[in-house]
Amino acid sequence: MRADHLKFAVLVSANAEWKALKPSFPEARIEDSPYGQFFFERVDEQTVLFCHGGWGKVAAAASTQYVIDRFNPERLINIGTCGGIEGRIRRFDVVVPDRVVIYDIHEAMGDDPREGVAYY
């Protein structure tokens, strides 16, 4: 499935988040990109690109730019949360931040957010 005019691209960073998302679309044809996996799916009569780009600011920036350059979506939606807010956000909460804190993440960190928090 390809989109002549792609309205939405959904970006997913963490492996655990990508693993949780894929079963929602069991018929999806998973493809590989230089940054991770992606697939197209129809959602409410719209073709939507779902892309796993990896975590960390470099991987996120690179995979986001790849999606923009290759697919030219009108809107980018980034799903997931950072591990530093554990216990403050519940499942299905929608978070609209009023500020962002950027810090370097420890590259050996896995998907368990406690590993990164313990490192710092």
What is the meaning of each model-derived region?
Residues 28-32, 68-72, 95-98, 113-117:
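Short, low-complexity, polar/charged sequence segments that are solvent-exposed and flexible
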Residues 57-58, 84-88:
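Short, electropositive, low-hydrophobicity segments enriched in small/polar residues
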Residues 17-19, 83-86:
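Short, active-site-adjacent cap segments at secondary-structure transitions
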Residues 2-71:
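N-terminal short beta-loop-beta anion/metal-coordinating cradle
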Residues 86-120:
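Mid-sequence, gly/pro-rich, charge-dense loop/helix-turn segments that line enzyme active sites
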Residues 75-77:
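Structural motif
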